[in-house]
Amino acid sequence: MSSDDTTPDETAPEHSPEPTPATSRRGFLKASGLGLAGLVVGGAAGAAAGAAIGHSIGYSEGQDDLGALTPRQVAGFEHIVVLMGENRSFDNMLGWLYTAETLPQGAKFDGLAFGDYSNKSPDGRTVKAHVYEGPTDVVMGKPNPDPGEEYPHVNTQLFGTVDPASNAELFAEQMHYPYNAPRDASKPTMDGFVKDYHINFERLHKGKEPTNEEGDQIMGGFSPEMLPVLSTLAREFAVFDHWYAGVPSQTYCNRSFFHASTSHGHVTNKGAGGYSKWLDAQPTPTVFNRLEEAGLTWRVYFDELQLISLTGMIHAPVLEKYWATERFAYMSQYYKDAREGTLPDYAFIEPRMVYNHNDFHPPFGALRESVIDGEVVVDSAVSDVRAGEALVHDVYNAIKHSATDKGSNALNTLLLITFDEHGGTYDHVAPPSATPPHPNTQPGEMGFTFDRLGLRVPAIAVSAYTRAGTIINDEMHHGSVISTLSRQHGLKPLNQ
């Protein structure tokens, strides 16, 4: 698939049309992404706003004694569409988006071209952050194999620690306390990515050490030319360079946090109880429930090949009753809704995450060995970021070409593209601390106290009223969309 096939159309509508009584929303958007940090709660207050960062022990989830917020009074977009990819850090996807020569005048961008970033390899070599090199079909599937993404692996990546040392030989669910976390109040050094990748590689390959090329790929990332769709949208609209995952771990807990402001104390997908722990979780309300209570519309779109919605499964205790309703629909319905102007007030899009991936996830799964032309080839599940690019292209164009007079259209719909977690790929920015959900909070799974956020992930806001070249430096995290919807519609908060 050539870049010409996937780059957003050059005939995109003007980003800053002259105000008219029917379309002027600049007072709300301020020509800056999601209405900037005033709309999506950020900064120190942002960390506090996501107080229930993944936890439930010692905390009353979805408290009903919280009053509804006052709806906003300034006109703005009426529809929000979120597309969430999988397992890529900000630096891995967008770290090279701008250089000193291409940076918009007066802007700041916390990317890789503005510093000297590296990790040490186990043999003492300096491995610098770099742009991927090699054949296109190989580069588009890097890093391969998939990095470690569970909480203990993230600890090694952030702090460079493996504690106890025996954890290096175990899979995450078998590891022991303190699960590679430092035993003091150390701050993240961001120097353990190569170390952890070597550990994970050797475990997956049953003791075989990676070559320098294999081990160094964890410090690699994509150039803008390699990701023409994401890069074009990030430059032509707004990019957030400090948007953090809610939990320093993997998919389920971060996707749970995104819509419920809690991961029920979990930091792994299936450790400590298996996948059933999500089905048996407390019936904690989500933002979907708040929208339903307010008489507003919402819909989760997922691929037909996926068979079930992961969002629906993660929040089964409160969303199962909607599984067989119009609230959960295939992607074909999304394109129909966008075309006919019937997108809901809030839409969440899931890519294919199990079969024939278009979610950007690095190749993962059991390693397979094959002999081809006498050479042993070891690989895992096929995954290619170009498939994710194609999905973003299609989702964006469906909104861009929506021109209905009533309902949703290109002028009143905001598209947010983000990712659930960094997935073990390199990022140079240490995640900030966060406010634990309760003064007497007890440790959750693997002893985590939910006092720090996950790593940076890509986040791009696309709106007809967003000025090209907008870079939002304010601190955001996965609780920000809930905050936006709550303030936009006067919903009852999910937590304090």
Q: Where do the PLM segments sit?
A:
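N-terminal pro-sequences and low-complexity stem/linker regions of secreted or lumenal proteins
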Residues: 2-5, 10-23, 30-496
